[in-house]
């Protein structure tokens, strides 16, 4: 596994944990499914976005906006 792939996996884990902190009624499976089925996740996978280099809080803001509005920005 490359360093870039590891950074992306760590970001997914961190996003799921942040989602659980804000929505404690979710299970870990639900939190991971939310992240993995999001447009934010698709953007994270694209190297050209550089999101894997950003802080989890920064990337979570995109996920949170997507969840609130139903679309990614």
Where in the sequence are the language-model features?
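C-terminal alpha-helical interaction appendages
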Residues: 1-73
């Amino acid at each position: 596994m490359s360093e870039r792939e590891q950074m992306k996996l760590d970001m997914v884990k961190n996003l799921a944990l942040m989602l659980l902190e804000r929505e404690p009624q979710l299970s870990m499976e639900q939190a991971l499914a939310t992240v993995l089925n999001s447009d934010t996740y698709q953007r994270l996978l694209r190297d050209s976005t550089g999101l894997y280099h950003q802080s989890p809080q920064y990337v979570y803001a995109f996920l949170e906006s997507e969840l609130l509005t139903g679309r990614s920005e």
